[in-house]
Amino acid sequence: MSERIVISPTSRQEGHAELVMEVDDEGIVTKGRYFSITPVRGLEKIVTGKAPETAPVIVQRICGVCPIPHTLASVEAIDDSLDIEVPKAGRLLRELTLAAHHVNSHAIHHFLIAPDFVPENLMADAINSVSEIRKNAQYVVDMVAGEGIHPSDVRIGGMADNITELARKRLYARLKQLKPKVDEHVELMIGLIEDKGLPKGLGVHNQPTLASHQIYGDRTKFDLDRFTEVMPESWYDDPEIAKRACSTIPLYDGRNVEVGPRARMVEFQGFKERGVVAQHVARALEMKTALARAIEILDELDTSAPVRADFDERGTGKLGVGAIEGPRGLDVHMAQVENGKIQFYSALVPTTWNIPTMGPATEGFHHEYGPHVIRAYDPCLSCATHVMVVDDEDRSVIRDEMVRL
């Protein structure tokens, strides 16, 4: 006889979500559904009608875990709408900011999954390693972008200022010194994850991967014409779940996809492994890739070069697209600027892409492994909330106009 297992909210993630699993007599998941129950904030609606420079400041507050990708995706979208060509040094500083954020965010995830993989006798060493890596990565973001949480120096047209030559040398030396610690930490985490003994094939699915760049992002690799979005009542076969779900379902070429570290490794480094262990391994390896890129940028950066372009902020109504590879995957912001005001704004964020893939990925294994599958995606639900309940009496969701966050 089928039984329903409900985990609400799922734990060790940002925001609130629910995992509903139908299981057979042996406890094996036959149907998995994962959905956001985090309420909408409506930040995209808040920026509509305002001056372009307000958008990055507001939408970076979509989430306290991933403000860097949202800031960068916002300025990239507005740059595109206003046809701004950002100077090379400005582009490098933006990428440096994101590369350091990748290292920091992936280290945070290792803290969240530590109870799953790290034995008690190694817990203190692992957490101290996470803390040291985070401290140094956040220092880079602070120095380059102004603040580690809400970066004030990332601007439309580029960056507020270049860093000094002294700062470049200090950051370069600091990251070179950090490299052995990151290498050691990655080796430790991969070893512990692979030795855990999770079932072979756990979390494997047949959905395609989607990524635009190994570290930063490339709007030319995201085709808006191949993207569609459906409401939850058209996706979930359970009407009650469809009513409660707070995110839309994005599709690429008509299919739900996986975004994130494994997707980037698949698309740009020929990574072949699939499933939960592969996702954790890819995320750990990406820490090394991101750190190496940050060091390369500091070696390449001309601190005397301009970092911001002049531009006319009036705009013509062109739809601009910003595609940024956040730690959790592809973060796409879209903006239209006309007559000096934002006429339209929408964000399509990583966890929104992953939600329809995560639930079915739990199927075929005992339900006790369900949370392992979910945590492998490092979900961020505040970012993923897209649907507003408009009738408290019957819990119906808005149909004709979606609120996208």
Curated annotation (Swiss-Prot):
Q: Which cofactor does it need?
A: Ni(2+); iron-sulfur cluster; FAD
Presence of the UniProt keyword Transport in the record: no
Q: Which UniProt keywords apply?
A: FAD, Flavoprotein, Metal-binding, Nickel, Oxidoreductase
Q: How is the cofactor bound?
A: There are 12-13 Fe atoms/(alpha(1)beta(1)gamma(1)) unit of the FRH.
| Molecular function as annotated in GO | coenzyme F420 hydrogenase activity; ferredoxin hydrogenase activity; flavin adenine dinucleotide binding; iron-sulfur cluster binding; nickel cation binding
Q: Where does Ni(2+) bind?
A: C63, C66, C380, C383
**Enzyme Commission designation:** 1.12.98.1
What is the reaction catalyzed?
oxidized coenzyme F420-(gamma-L-Glu)(n) + H2 + H(+) = reduced coenzyme F420-(gamma-L-Glu)(n)
**Signal peptide feature range:** none
Tell me the protein family, please. Answer: Belongs to the [NiFe]/[NiFeSe] hydrogenase large subunit family.
Q: Subunit details for this protein?
A: Heterocomplex of the form (alpha(1)beta(1)gamma(1))(8).
Record's function text? Reduces the physiological low-potential two-electron acceptor coenzyme F420, and the artificial one-electron acceptor methylviologen.
The identity of this protein, by name, is: Coenzyme F420 hydrogenase subunit alpha
Species in which this protein is naturally found: Methanothermobacter thermautotrophicus (strain ATCC 29096 / DSM 1053 / JCM 10044 / NBRC 100330 / Delta H)
Gene that specifies this protein: frhA
